[in-house]
């Protein structure tokens, strides 16, 4: 089973809010998820990025792949550097 770390859109129209989730690569964007590991709120100034580092590193060690957007958020939060150091 291919597992990806990606964003799940939440919120209202014109007021998006995203959850950073671990999901099967074949499931729909807002479909069933395996685990929620954080959130991203682009509406706040500055944009809020909160990621549970312990869960994120655990999933990356298990082989979960990051989408481009999730990779940018992980880089911004400093999680990607910690994973590459280990």
From Swiss-Prot:
The keyword Ribonucleoprotein applies. GO terms for molecular function: structural constituent of ribosome. One of its GO terms (cellular component) is cytoplasm. Keywords: Ribonucleoprotein, Ribosomal protein. It comes from the Bacteria. GO terms for biological process: translation. This is Small ribosomal subunit protein bS16. Belongs to the bacterial ribosomal protein bS16 family. The keyword Translocase does not apply.
């Amino acid at each position: 089973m291919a597992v990806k770390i990606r964003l799940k859109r939440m919120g209202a129209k014109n007021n998006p809010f995203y959850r950073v989730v671990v999901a099967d690569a074949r499931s729909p964007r807002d479909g069933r998820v395996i685990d929620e590991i954080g959130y991203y709120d682009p509406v706040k100034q500055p944009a809020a990025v909160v990621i549970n580092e312990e869960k994120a590193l655990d999933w990356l060690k298990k082989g979960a792949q990051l989408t481009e957007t999730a990779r940018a958020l992980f880089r911004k939060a400093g999680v990607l550097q910690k994973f590459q150091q280990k």
